[in-house]
Amino acid sequence: MVMTDPIADMLTRIRNANLARHETVEIPSSKMKKAIAMILLKEGFVKAVEEIDDGKGGILKITLKYGPNKERVISGLKRISKPGLRVYAKHDELPRVLGGLGIAIISTSKGIMTDKEARKAGLGGEVICYVW
């Protein structure tokens, strides 16, 4: 079966593993998925990101992060721009997620970055997802 939205699949796999309190989640790799995973790592939402070569496209192994009493660090993931309805925002219209507590991941002409980085660089782009 052909996957129509690989980014939504990635977010759903992370969301499901997080809700089931799994330690790791494995996702088929791509450049965009790796960039999103690296942002989640840099922003402190996940513990580690590892790329495994399986002879095909590769696999991203994401180690999820939990608090001392197994409380979830990621409380929500939401896909915004979908293949059927793309969502774009100018640099001055970039959304603030939960008043700055969460992040929006934006695909800009300079690569994939958070809403804060895009605002600072004065770049707009496609709003991929929200993480809080």
Swiss-Prot record:
A GO MF term: rRNA binding
Annotated Gene3D superfamilies: 3.30.1370.30, 3.30.1490.10
A Gene Ontology BP annotation from the UniProt entry: translation
Stored InterPro entries: Ribosomal_uS8, Ribosomal_uS8_CS, Ribosomal_uS8_sf
Gene Ontology CC entries for this record: ribonucleoprotein complex; ribosome
Keywords for the protein's UniProt record, in alphabetical order: Ribonucleoprotein, Ribosomal protein, RNA-binding, rRNA-binding
Pfam families, sorted: Ribosomal_S8
Assembly and interaction partners: Part of the 30S ribosomal subunit. Contacts proteins S5 and S12.
HAMAP family per record: Ribosomal_uS8_B
Family stated for the protein in its record: Belongs to the universal ribosomal protein uS8 family.
Main function: One of the primary rRNA binding proteins, it binds directly to 16S rRNA central domain where it helps coordinate assembly of the platform of the 30S subunit.
Protein's UniProt name: Small ribosomal subunit protein uS8
Taxonomic lineage of the native organism: Bacteria, Bacillati, Bacillota, Clostridia, Thermoanaerobacterales
